[in-house]
Amino acid sequence: MIRNFVAKFTLLSLLALLFVACNDAVTYSEMKEKERNAVNRFIKENGIKVISFADFVANDSVTDVAKNEFVEIDGVYMQIVNNPADAADALKLKDGESRTFLVRYNEYNIQEGDTISTNIYMGEPDEMRVTNNSGTFSATFTSGVMMALYSTSYVPSGWLTPFGFLYFTRSTSNLAKVNLIVPHTKGTSNASTYVYPCLYSITFQPERSYVYDED
């Protein structure tokens, strides 16, 4: 299933490359402006309330889902849909730790209005290895759709924005979940090349050993 998905994606990427080659009169500045307009339009059309980082912190790092709040952090708009901080087994990724997370996601091109990829209906989730180095997070994919689709282990840096604020649990009914509006500068290699923003809906589940590790 992943192989067929990747083949289709590769064809679409080649068509996109052909389009860019035929439309090379468009400048990078114009592409960025088009991206900004797409994000602003998406925010307006979906009734998203953007709050400041200061308000986010003052509210205990909570975004009110009922009010459709997103907080902007370094160009990424983040909505924390569920943060299982009160779960009995809730843990954060501590300084110096590296852990594997199981990830379910949906990737939506805001500019074109199309779903690019998803593993929601796949048999296995994607896996990503995340490291906390003094509050700076880095990650690599170790398996899954994203790794196969983009032929790289690189995790979009925008995906790491929530890690400083989230708690994690293995309970499938209480997984950490976020919605992210990610600009091309913090997105996939394709997003960076063709300059488009994406909406990601992502759940994170730590690998089993994470819950039982000793301090």
What are these regions (language model features)?
Residues 2, 22-215:
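Cross-family detector of peptidyl-prolyl cis-trans isomerase
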